[in-house]
């Protein structure tokens, strides 16, 4: 059972659901964090932090910040629409739904009741080649707003965040019904008129949007005539968790918002480390970013009120890092509670920072550890146990500490180096160029053994004649 497997969909069905849910979630933000994401990747959180923050606000020639109308910025709104359409989804208009509530020029729907008017949601459809509606996607936006009204909308959403934690009983549970009760009825009617059932609906969202996903799941049995009781619910970075198994709650262990509430209850741990496992949550996925890696940043306590920790919360980091888990060759071996370290370092930090399990601000990690590299040139270090390491693309350097690791190299993986390889390790080559006979690929070069697959290679540093066991190499 894979780490993101959902209900009885099986692995491939669950992967498709995850990809759809992520595409819808990212679209709901309209690329709002594009400037920060690009600035962070180029400049990091160290000496380049000022440039990262400038990029977040003003963008650059290759990104759009949160301030609209900067002439040298690309149109990230257009890019967001193109991305969700490429994933197979198209926004459904208010007129098609017969809905008379507030909607903006982009087709985003706004909350209906007083106190919820800054909530936002997207409604999308997936169609076959003949134009027949196959599925409906509902994407709740997290705390933020369109660039033009970002400050006022964010303040309204922050009030909702506080009320969910500290306000009236069941505020979080009832949130989706209060904010979008009328719209969701129209969507249910529209779906039914096109021959769809709740099973054909994907509900997704991030942060406050993830809270809305859990809320809608909680309400689904008795609201909207029960239409959504069998819908598919995937929430990212939600502070709350719905009771039961309707929702798959996905998040980074070091995201201060994810699981901040116990169910929907606030307690003292909500303000600090909150790593309690829940039935519906992924509990041990780490975003190995500049903040997590830095001893200096971690002098300050881990807390939802410590703003630097929020780098682990941004939607772009979810889209990139979580998708690499989904596409990993180790996916089938990962369970809901596996320890998974995802490389999300900036370019400056990646050059001299070893990606590894620091087990920071969390309960002790147990069992095998999976480390997933990026498309850049990563430095990856295994621990003392049995690790599963996939460097990804780029020219990676991998340090082996235990001698009981499995290294996976897939497709065009670059020119990698393994330091400390031992015969008890396992090398797995998947979808690589050439034959499946190790003798066609292995050659001793000086004091090293080099395995070459077309333009890609792995150098086993310090491993000469007799140091490589054929039993420990799989080529497929």
UniProtKB/Swiss-Prot annotation:
| Coiled-coil intervals | none
Its domain of life? Bacteria
**GO molecular function terms here?**
calcium ion binding; triacylglycerol lipase activity
Spans of repeat Hemolysin-type calcium-binding: 372-389, 390-407, 410-427
Q: Which InterPro entries match?
A: AB_hydrolase_fold, Hemolysin-typ_Ca-bd_CS, Hemolysn_Ca-bd, Serralysin-like_metalloprot_C
Q: What Enzyme Commission number(s) appear in the record?
A: 3.1.1.3
Q: State the UniProt keywords alphabetically.
A: Calcium, Hydrolase, Lipid degradation, Lipid metabolism, Metal-binding, Repeat, Signal
Q: Which SUPFAM superfamilies match?
A: alpha/beta-Hydrolases (SSF53474), beta-Roll (SSF51120)
Chain sites annotated for binding Ca(2+): 437, 440, 448
One short Pfam family name for this protein?
A: HemolysinCabind
Catalytic activity annotated for this protein? a triacylglycerol + H2O = a diacylglycerol + a fatty acid + H(+)
Task: Tell me the first and last residues of the signal peptide.
Answer: 1-23
Gene3D superfamilies from the entry? alpha/beta hydrolase (3.40.50.1820), Serralysin-like metalloprotease, C-terminal (2.150.10.10)
Q: Which family does it belong to?
A: Belongs to the AB hydrolase superfamily. Lipase family.
Q: What is this protein called?
A: Lipase
């Amino acid at each position: 059972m894979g780490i993101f497997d959902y209900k009885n969909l099986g692995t491939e069905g669950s992967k498709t659901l995850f990809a759809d849910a992520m595409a819808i979630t990212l679209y709901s933000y309209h690329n709002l964090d594009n400037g920060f994401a690009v600035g962070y990747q180029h400049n990091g959180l160290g000496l380049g932090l000022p440039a990262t923050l400038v990029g977040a606000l003003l963008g650059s020639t290759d990104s759009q910040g949160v301030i609209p109308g900067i002439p040298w910025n690309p149109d990230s709104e257009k890019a967001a629409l193109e991305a969700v359409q490429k994933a197979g989804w198209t926004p459904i208009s208010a007129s098609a739904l017969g809905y008379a509530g507030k909607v903006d020029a982009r087709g985003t729907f706004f909350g209906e009741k007083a106190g919820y008017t800054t909530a936002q949601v997207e409604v999308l459809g997936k169609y076959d080649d003949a134009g027949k509606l196959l599925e409906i996607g509902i994407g709740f936006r997290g705390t933020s707003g369109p660039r033009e009204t970002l400050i006022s909308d964010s303040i309204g959403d922050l009030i909702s965040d506080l009320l969910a934690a500290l306000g009236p009983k069941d505020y979080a549970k009832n949130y989706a019904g209060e904010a979008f009760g009328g719209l969701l009825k129209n969507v249910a009617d529209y779906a039914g008129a096109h021959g769809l059932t709740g099973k054909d609906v994907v509900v997704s969202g991030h942060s406050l949007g993830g809270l809305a996903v859990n809320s809608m799941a909680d309400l689904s049995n008795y609201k909207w005539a029960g239409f959504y009781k069998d819908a598919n619910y995937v929430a990212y970075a939600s502070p709350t968790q719905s009771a039961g198994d309707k929702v798959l709650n996905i998040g980074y262990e070091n995201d201060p918002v994810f699981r901040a509430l116990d169910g929907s209850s606030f307690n003292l741990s909500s303000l600090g480390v909150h790593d309690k496992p829940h039935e519906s949550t992924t509990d041990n996925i780490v975003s190995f970013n500049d903040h997590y890696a830095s001893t200096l940043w971690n002098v300050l306590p881990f807390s939802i009120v410590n703003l630097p920790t929020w780098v682990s919360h941004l939607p772009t980091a979810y889209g990139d890092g979580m998708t690499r888990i989904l596409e990993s060759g180790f996916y089938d071996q990962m369970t809901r509670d596996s320890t998974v370290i995802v490389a999300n370092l900036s370019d400056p930090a990646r050059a001299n920072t070893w990606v590894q399990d620091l087990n920071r601000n969390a309960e002790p990690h147990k069992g095998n550890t999976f480390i997933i590299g990026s498309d850049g040139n990563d430095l990856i270090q295994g621990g003392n146990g049995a690790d599963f390491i996939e460097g990804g693309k780029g020219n990676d350097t991998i340090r082996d500490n235990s001698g009981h690791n499995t290294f996976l190299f897939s497709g065009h993986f670059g020119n990698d180096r393994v330091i400390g390889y031992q015969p008890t390790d396992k090398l797995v080559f998947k979808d690589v160029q050439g034959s499946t006979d190790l003798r066609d690929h292995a050659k001793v070069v000086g004091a090293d053994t080099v395995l070459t697959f077309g333009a890609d290679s792995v150098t086993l540093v310090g491993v000469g004649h007799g140091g490589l066991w054929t039993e420990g190499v799989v080529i497929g």
